[in-house]
Amino acid sequence: MKKLKLMTIVGTRPEIIKMSAIIKKADKYFDHILVHTGQNYDYNLNEVFFKDLGLREPNYYLGVVGKNIGETMGNVISKAYDLMVEVKPDAVIVLGDTNSCLSIIAAKRLKIPIFHMEAGNRCKDENLPEEVIRRIVDVTSDVNLCYSEHARRYILDTGVKPEYTYVVGSPMAEVLKDVLPQIEASTVLGDLGLEKGKYILLSAHREENIDIEANFMSLMNAVNEMARTYDMPVLYSCHPRSEKMIEKRGFKFDERVIQHKPLGFFDYNKLQQNAFCVVSDSGTVPEEGAFFHFPAVSVRTSTERPEAMDKGVFTIGSITSEAVCQAVALATEMHANGDDPYPVPAYTDENVSTKVVKLIQSYVGIINKMVWRKA
């Protein structure tokens, strides 16, 4: 029997991680085409995660990176269009808010049903390029799959059809549970000479934190202040973008700050699990913090995870030295006193991939009939 032909499009580390369980299940139940746009082209930012998460190689690699953001976005749409014309998928699924998600514009023009994971997330901060993409992808998609009721309310306010909008939960619990033995087996602490609870883990790579000089300097000064205040190593998982800016601006770190290339999925989560505090601008830290129960501070001024704030999973620390250090002090003291957050219902489901696969199978025919009026 002919199976439904699904095209999954990814392009960045978070997309690969969060889609990994869905990719495996789609391989099992669909005629599945896996596409990597090449938005992140550094080995440590994508290929290593395919290996760690037990994913096969993509069927197609688009190589979309151009000489500027505009050319890259245009390449995403153009190259995705050409590929869709060639392979003729029955449906397309994307996750999140990256440039790679703009590939669905091609699918829309070709009248291919579109499914969007992580739909409805909003931080209400127009300085974030992701916020613009979220709105575009939400209203362009045919079926929106939200993590939480917060997200569903946000997206319904934009006028999308409620009958094509579902809350499926975050996929991270399913992903993390599946690889927990490998995370536990990681020897990264010993390899790096770190002790449990005696280091701070830092990840900062967002455009607004790195490319805006005032924000960059403020955040880097906060890093040095943390090292001095707590007199312990600060391990900075440093993305290529961040490393270039540090070199360009000649910033000097405290001797206790350790710059390290991006780590593999198992090693990074082992480090999060055992850190004195995790300080990050990553969008996944609320979900990982909810799973592992580590003290977490977000070095941002907004969040698209209000459901995690509702339960006290993390603290927003802004990016000034004083505010970040205050947030770290509060988060670590509360954790030491056993004053920990409540579980986030949207982050506990371990069968998200099953729900997503069934929704795709259910709605391709409905979208073709009700939206595109196909026979």
Question: Residue locations for each model-derived region?
Answer:
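Nucleotide-activated sugar donor-binding and catalytic core shared by glycosyltransferases
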Residues: 1-232, 242-375
